Amino acid sequence: MESQQLSQHSPISHGSACASVTSKEVHTNQDPLDVSASKTEECEKASTKANSQQTTTPASSAVPENPHHASPQTAQSHSPQNGPYPQQCMMTQNQANPSGWSFYGHPSMIPYTPYQMSPMYFPPGPQSQFPQYPSSVGTPLSTPSPESGNTFTDSSSADSDMTSTKKYVRPPPMLTSPNDFPNWVKTYIKFLQNSNLGGIIPTVNGKPVRQITDDELTFLYNTFQIFAPSQFLPTWVKDILSVDYTDIMKILSKSIEKMQSDTQEANDIVTLANLQYNGSTPADAFETKVTNIIDRLNNNGIHINNKVACQLIMRGLSGEYKFLRYTRHRHLNMTVAELFLDIHAIYEEQQGSRNSKPNYRRNPSDEKNDSRSYTNTTKPKVIARNPQKTNNSKSKTARAHNVSTSNNSPSTDNDSISKSTTEPIQLNNKHDLHLRPETY
């Protein structure tokens, strides 16, 4: 019984224990109860081979290699010697292939020691219970996985503040080229968000929402190592890992910055291709906007020369600025600064002409007064003709009275009357009408 306890608590595996004994010890002193049947058969085979060669069998040749058990020497964590990842933690391509892996929903579902990669992500048993972060921490699952029907059996011994994992998360694809890293890191960030680790992802300002734990850092390092092999990483990622091979957070932060830069580049190109200017805004503001866009594109590796920039600017000119297309298109060596000198000249000329014009604006009341004065000029014509008619009517009455009383008046009066009747009557009007006596 004492030998059984020693064999159970020994840090060395049974295979190595059997390999360390000689053939003589196997036949004479070995207790068959100390090891299993399979180990006994291995020891007997090793002893038979040792007897035939008359030499002691080394441990490395006696025990067959077991790929699912790591020796104590390889289970330790060391700094990387060559490459961004430690050689002890690297996996073969068959082990890293996610096609045969089970989908998982939380870092604690993967049983491994810190900073050491397990041979495989073995699926947990049906009775296994794994803790999960509460809903207030991290990012919830955004979309259900196609394999969401597979669930774990609940256990009554779970803590009150922990819930069992009910959904699996699809792992990201394998990185196969350095050029695919920008697209791959997007899927990897989505994978972390679906794994309730959205809070540790750096935001726009480069800082995460919450502090990452040691277990989460281990999960981050291991998954990044498996899905992004070192030979397919870009140069800038290898430079970061060469300083600290566990600094995955810095890689994510730099990747997010590059994503934002790519988005800004696309927006700048669209803005530069759709420029419009007609003098409605100050020329200084328009020049600042265009030069800032060109400088950003040049700094990000998208070089815009003077010829292309001038063509894009002139294509968006309208109004009085449109003629610059025809006066400057023959100048092959024209720069953006020279083009903006012409734009400034036209803008200043427009502002000067606007300032020279009177700013007086006629009020509606003035227009009403003008209309009233116009009507008053026509009315005197009507009013001037009416008194004439009344005066003529009075003169007619007076003359008729004189005619009726002509018999009693002297002859001189008759002569004057007859003389006055033969003379034309002058009307004080504009038309200078001459009325004969027959019209009365």
Swiss-Prot record:
Residues 429-440 have a biased composition (Basic and acidic residues). Residues 153-165, 402-418 have a biased composition (Low complexity). The record marks 401-402 as: Cleavage. It comes from the Eukaryota. It is found in: Cytoplasm. Residues 1-93, 126-173, 352-440 are annotated as: Disordered. Induction: Ty1-PR1 is a highly expressed element. Induced under amino acid starvation conditions by GCN4. Signal peptide: none annotated. Residues 299-401 are annotated as: RNA-binding. One of its GO terms (cellular component) is cytoplasm. GO terms for biological process: viral translational frameshifting. Pfam families: TYA (PF01021). Its main location: cytoplasm. Capsid protein (CA) is the structural component of the virus-like particle (VLP), forming the shell that encapsulates the retrotransposons dimeric RNA genome. The particles are assembled from trimer-clustered units and there are holes in the capsid shells that allow for the diffusion of macromolecules. CA also has nucleocapsid-like chaperone activity, promoting primer tRNA(i)-Met annealing to the multipartite primer-binding site (PBS), dimerization of Ty1 RNA and initiation of reverse transcription. Retrotransposons are mobile genetic entities that are able to replicate via an RNA intermediate and a reverse transcription step. In contrast to retroviruses, retrotransposons are non-infectious, lack an envelope and remain intracellular. Ty1 retrotransposons belong to the copia elements (pseudoviridae). Homotrimer. This is Transposon Ty1-PR1 Gag polyprotein. It comes from Saccharomyces cerevisiae (strain ATCC 204508 / S288c).
